[in-house]
From Swiss-Prot:
Cited InterPro entries: THDP-binding, Transketo_C/PFOR_II, Transketolase-like_C_2, Transketolase-like_Pyr-bd, Transketolase_bac-like, Transketolase_CS, Transketolase_fam, Transketolase_N
E.C. number: 2.2.1.1
Pathway: Carbohydrate biosynthesis; Calvin cycle
Sites where the protein binds thiamine diphosphate: 143, 192-194, 234, 263, 340, 488, 515
The family this protein is said to belong to: Belongs to the transketolase family.
Organismal lineage: Eukaryota, Viridiplantae, Streptophyta, Embryophyta, Tracheophyta
Subunit structure, interactors included: Homodimer.
Protein name per UniProt: Transketolase, chloroplastic
Organism: Spinacia oleracea
Region of interest called Disordered, as start-end residue ranges on this chain: 1-33
Length: 741
C-alpha cells in the first residue's frame, strides 16, 4: 500500500521509496551480479553460482534491458528495509521449521520483491481485505506461501496473527500449505498447481480492464487497480501459463505486472536439465513488455525502478524477470534444490541467523519493523474512505451505471432476474439444448450485469454468443464476449480469476464436453476455491455423431460426480435448460457444468425449472401409493427415450414412473423424505438410461436394477445409427424393464 512513512528523520529518499507515483530519474544500471565464487554481498555469504546464468539475453532485434536505477546513498531507511526483508525471511524459515514441512527457499529469495510490493507499492486496506479498488496480489508459485503469509502478518491483516504463523500446515490452521482464498482473507485466489495462479491473475486483470472501460468516466475514475504476480520457473514450464499469458498480451492488459522468480532451481536440480528456453524473448513475442532485474537478492532500487517503468507501459502487460538465489542467506543450502521443499534443519537455521546477522528468537518481529508496517492500517482505511467518497459522487452523477456496478461488486442481482429465463411447453418446437442454452444466456445477459464469457474457438458450435454484445478486444474493452481461442485450460483458469475478482461476476466458458480433459485442472480449482464459473459443455454424448470417438465424451458424465463442490447438470429440454441456468447463477460458490446436446430434443410433458432444483424428480407416473412396478431414470437426451419406453410399458398395463435425473449432486442434497418420494426404497425394479459410462449408476438402480449405457468408446456414424448399435433405444429400455419387474 503506497503511502508516506511515519519515520520523521528520513529525507526525500523516503518519499522516493514509498510512493508508487513518484517519478525517479533513471541512470544506467550497474551490473550487480551474484558472485561466481563464494563471497559476500552486503555482508551475506553466498554460494558460488554459474556466471552463464546471469548473461544478458539478446535477440536479433533487441536486447532485454536491465532495470535502470538511480544511485542513492545508504540511509536509515535502507537499514530498515533490510531488517524488514530479513523479518519476512525468518518468519518463513521459522514457520516451516516449526511445521517441519514447507518451502522456505522461495520466500527467502523473493522477500525483497514481497517487501517492496506490500510496503511501498500496493494499495489495500488490511482491515477490509475485500475493498473493491485494492490492488490484487497472486502468488502463482503457491508452494512459497509463507512469503505471502509473512507479508499479510506484517501488513496488519487479522487473518494472519503471530499464533497463526505457529500453526502453519497444521489441522485447523488459517494458513494452509498452499494459498487458499476461502481460508485466508487477503489471499485472492487458490494457487499451488503451477501455472494456475498466473492464469487466474490474467482473469483478475481482465476483469479490471473490463470494469474500467465500462464504468469509468472522464470526471470519475472508480476502477483503477493493478494485479501483481510472482511466478517461478515451474509456472513458466506449464502449458496453462503459456495459454493465459498469450491472451494477456493479445488483450493488452497493461495493469498486469508479473515478477518471474528466475532462480534456476527445480525440485530435480538446476533448470538446465529441462528448461533452457529464453523466457524473455518468448514473452516479448507474446506481446509483453519485459524488464530484467539482475540482482533480486539485494537490488531494491532495481526492483523499484522496474515497477516504475512497468507502470508507464499501459498498452501491454509487463514481465519483470528477477534473478534471485533460492534460499538466499542460507550458507550451505542456498542455490540448491535442497532448500526448495523442506525445512532447513536446526543447524542450518542457526547458520543462516549468523550469516544474516539475525539475533532474534523465532517468530520475532523487531519493534522498528512493526512500527514501520503499522501505518498500513490507518492509511488503508483512508484509501478506502477516499474511494467511498469518490463513488458516492459517482452514484449521484451516474445512478444507472452505479446500480449495475454495485450489482457486480456486491453480488446482489436485480430482483426477479430469474423471470427473464424463457419457459417452454410440450407444444414449443423442440431444439438442441445447446441452442436452448443460447436463448437462456442471452435472456440473462439483459438482466444480470456481471454475466460475461466466451468459448474456446467454438462459439458457433457451443452457441454461446451474446447477441446484444460485441467481442472484448484491445480497443473494445466494454464488451462481454471473450474469444479465448483454442486454450481450454487457460480459459477455465481465467474465468476463475474473473469470478473471484468481484462476487457479482458470473463468468461462463464453453467447449465440447470431451475437452474438459484439457481443462480439468482449472475446473478442480474452481470447485476448491468456490468460484461459481458456469461451464457450458456441448456435444455431450454419442449424439454428436460423425465426429466419432475422439469427440464423444463417454466417460465425462461419470467422472465429475467424484469431484467435491461441483454441480453436473444434464438438461433434457427447454425447461430443464432454463432450470439449470437458474441453479448455476444462484450457486456463486459452486461451479456448474451444463452438459448440452447437439441433437434436437422435444420439450417433454412434466419437466420444470423447479424440478431441476431438486436434482431428480418425477415427470410422469401412473402408479398409486408410491409403488410403481418399475422406475425409469433418464438424463438429458435419454429422458425422451425413457418417456417413450414408459408409454409403451403402460400400454401393457405396467405402473411406470419416469424420473428425470438432471443432477446427482442436487438430488443428494435433498431430504431423505423427498428422495424416498422419488425413488422409494422398496421399489427395486429400476432402469437407468444414459448415453455414457454406466459407472456409478448402480448406486441409483441397485443390485436388482439395470443400467443402460456405454462402457466402450463410441464410433463415427450418424447419431441415430450409433444409438441403435449401442442399444440406447426404447426397445432396449422396455426389454430391460420387463426383466426387472
Amino acid at each position: 500500500m503506497a503511502a508516506s512513512s511515519s519515520l520523521s528523520t528520513l529525507s526525500h529518499h523516503q518519499t522516493l521509496l514509498s510512493h508508487p507515483k513518484t517519478h525517479l530519474p533513471t541512470t544506467p544500471a550497474s551490473s550487480l551480479l551474484v558472485p561466481t565464487t563464494s563471497s559476500k554481498v552486503n555482508g551475506v555469504l553466498l554460494k558460488s553460482t554459474s556466471s552463464s546464468r546471469r548473461l544478458r539475453v539478446g535477440s536479433a532485434s533487441a536486447v532485454v534491458r536491465a532495470a535502470a536505477v538511480e544511485a542513492l546513498e545508504s540511509t536509515d531507511i535502507d537499514q530498515l528495509v533490510e531488517k524488514s526483508v530479513n523479518t519476512i525471511r525468518f518468519l518463513a524459515i521459522d514457520a516451516v521449521e516449526k511445521a517441519n514441512s514447507g518451502h522456505p527457499g522461495l520466500p527467502m529469495g523473493c522477500a525483497p520483491m514481497g517487501h517492496i510490493l506490500y510496503d511501498e507499492i500496493m494499495r489495500y486496506n488490511p482491515k477490509n481485505p475485500y475493498w473493491f479498488n485494492r490492488d490484487r496480489f497472486v502468488l502463482s508459485a503457491g508452494h512459497g506461501c509463507m512469503l505471502q503469509y509473512a507479508l499479510l502478518h506484517l501488513a496488519g491483516y487479522d487473518s494472519v496473527l503471530e499464533e497463526d504463523l505457529k500453526t502453519f500446515r497444521q489441522w485447523g490452521s488459517r494458513i494452509p500449505g498452499h494459498p487458499e482464498n476461502f481460508e485466508t482473507p487477503g489471499v485472492e485466489v487458490t494457487t499451488g498447481p503451477l501455472g494456475q495462479g498466473i492464469a487466474n491473475a490474467v482473469g483478475l486483470a481482465l476483469a479490471e480492464k473490463h470494469l474500467a472501460a465500462r464504468f469509468n468516466k472522464p470526471d470519475a475514475e472508480i476502477v483503477d487497480h493493478y494485479t501483481y504476480v510472482i511466478l517461478g520457473d515451474g509456472c513458466q514450464m506449464e502449458g496453462i501459463a503459456q495459454e493465459a499469458c498469450s491472451l494477456a498480451g493479445h488483450w493488452g492488459l497493461g495493469k498486469l505486472i508479473a515478477f518471474y522468480d528466475d532462480n534456476h532451481i527445480s525440485i530435480d536440480g538446476d533448470t538446465a536439465i529441462a528448461f533452457t528456453e529464453s523466457v524473455d524473448l518468448r514473452f516479448e513475442a507474446l506481446g509483453w513488455h519485459v524488464i530484467w532485474v539482475k540482482n533480486g537478492n539485494t537490488g531494491y532500487d532495481e526492483i523499484r525502478a522496474a515497477i516504475k517503468e512497468a507502470k508507464t507501459v499501459t498498452d501491454k502487460p509487463t514481465l519483470i524477470k528477477v534473478t534471485t538465489t533460492i534460499g538466499f542467506g542460507s550458507p550451505n543450502k542456498s542455490n540448491s534444490y535442497s532448500v526448495h521443499g523442506s525445512a532447513l534443519g536446526s543447524k542450518e537455521v542457526e547458520a543462516t541467523r549468523q550469516n544474516l546477522g539475525w539475533p532474534y528468537e523465532p517468530f520475532h518481529v523487531p519493534e522498528e519493523v512493526k512500527k514501520h508496517w503499522s501505518r498500513h492500517t490507518p492509511e488503508g482505511a483512508s484509501l478506502e474512505a477516499e474511494w467511498n467518497t469518490k463513488f458516492a459522487e459517482y452514484e449521484k452523477k451516474y445512478p444507472e451505471d452505479a446500480t449495475e456496478f454495485k450489482s457486480i461488486t456486491t453480488g446482489e442481482f436485480p430482483a426477479g432476474w430469474e423471470k427473464a429465463l424463457p419457459t417452454y411447453t410440450p407444444e414449443t418446437p423442440g431444439d438442441a439444448t445447446r441452442n436452448l442454452s443460447q436463448q437462456c444466456l442471452n435472456a440473462l445477459a439483459k438482466v444480470i450485469p456481471g454475466l460475461l464469457g466466451g468459448s474456446a474457438d467454438l462459439a458457433s458450435s457451443n452457441m454461446t454468443l451474446l447477441k446484444m454484445f460485441g467481442d472484448f478486444r484491445r480497443t473494445h474493452r466494454k464488451k462481454e464476449t471473450f474469444r479465448f481461442g483454442v486454450r481450454e485450460h487457460g480459459m477455465g483458469a481465467i474465468c476463475n480469476g474473473i469470478c473471484l475478482h468481484s462476487p457479482g461476476f458470473v463468468p461462463y466458458c464453453a467447449t465440447f464436453f470431451v475437452f474438459t480433459d484439457y481443462m480439468r485442472g482449472a475446473m478442480r480449482i474452481s470447485a476448491l476455491s468456490e468460484a461459481g464459473v458456469i461451464y457450458v459443455m456441448t456435444h455431450d454424448s454419442i449424439g454428436l455423431g460423425e465426429d466419432g470417438p475422439t469427440h464423444q465424451p463417454i466417460e465425462a458424465l461419470s467422472k465429475f460426480p467424484a469431484m467435491p463442490n461441483i454441480l453436473m447438470l444434464r438438461p433434457a429440454d427447454g425447461n430443464e435448460t432454463a432450470g439449470s441456468y437458474k441453479v448455476a447463477v444462484e450457486n456463486r460458490k459452486t461451479p456448474s457444468i451444463l452438459a448440452l446436446s447437439r441433437k434436437k430434443l422435444p420439450n417433454l410433458p412434466g419437466t420444470s425449472i423447479e424440478g431441476v432444483e431438486k436434482g431428480g424428480y418425477t415427470i410422469t407416473d401412473n402408479s398409486s401409493g408410491n409403488k410403481p412396478d418399475v422406475i425409469l431414470i433418464g438424463t438429458g437426451s435419454e429422458l425422451e427415450i425413457a418417456a417413450k419406453a414408459g408409454d409403451e410399458l403402460r400400454k401393457e398395463g405396467k405402473a411406470v414412473r419416469v424420473v428425470s435425473f438432471v443432477s446427482w449432486e442436487l438430488f443428494e442434497k435433498q431430504s431423505d423424505e423427498y428422495k424416498e418420494s422419488v425413488l422409494p426404497s422398496d421399489v427395486t425394479a429400476r432402469v437407468s438410461i444414459e448415453a455414457g459410462s454406466t459407472f456409478g449408476w448402480h448406486k441409483i438402480v441397485g443390485s436388482k436394477g439395470k443400467a443402460i449405457g456405454i462402457d466402450k468408446f463410441g464410433a463415427s456414424a450418424p447419431a441415430g445409427k450409433i444409438y441403435q448399435e449401442y442399444g440406447i433405444t426404447v426397445e432396449a429400455v422396455v426389454e430391460a424393464a420387463k426383466s426387472v419387474c
